[in-house]
Design a protein with these regions (language model features):
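Metal-ion/cofactor- or nucleotide/acyl-coenzyme-handling active-site neighborhoods
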Residues: 1-161
Length: 161
């Protein structure tokens, strides 16, 4: 999982690349309970340092790369909407600590798309499933191993794995 998802439930692995939320995660001791990856671990923490070539990537792409490095053959991208339908910041954690306001402009998604394409290219035997709904923007991925599926199809697939 990425960033503030630990507020909802404790994932097995967590990634945060933005320093403020990464520091908060370490200060709360989350890095001692689960595997936590960040760019700059606080000295004395159990956080793991993101290595190159993924060091400069955003949290979502780093999480994808970690899943691949750890041997996943199917990676499901949940919450990767890559855009906004109303020109506003669309994040489930908008208006909370470390996040923009829901009325702010959306974050540019081009970097995420580029980073995910590069990861998919580096791991051609992994199938990436972008789970979307009707409101998600279409994205033209350059790799054949990135597939768009709807939420209903995801539920069927995940229950078979």
């Amino acid at each position: 999982g990425c960033n503030a998802i630990y507020r909802e439930f404790m994932p097995h692995v967590l990634v945060a690349t933005d320093r403020l939320i990464a520091n908060k995660i370490q200060e709360e001791g989350i890095d001692k309970k689960i595997k936590f990856w960040t760019r700059r671990p606080i000295q004395g923490s159990k956080a793991l340092k993101i290595e190159r070539p993924y060091y400069g990537n955003s949290s979502g792409p780093v999480a994808l790369s970690r899943a691949c490095i750890d041997g996943a053959t199917h990676v499901f991208l949940l919450g990767f909407d890559f855009g906004s339908t109303d020109d506003k910041f669309n994040n489930v954690y908008a208006d909370t600590e470390f996040y923009k306001k829901s009325t702010d402009k959306p974050t540019f998604a081009g970097n995420w798309i580029y980073q995910i394409n590069e990861i998919a290219k580096a791991f051609p035997r992994v199938t990436f499933f972008r789970v979307k709904d009707q409101s998600f923007s279409d994205v033209d991925f350059t790799n054949n191993n990135i597939v768009n599926i709807m939420m209903d199809e995801f539920k069927l697939k995940i229950n078979k794995l």
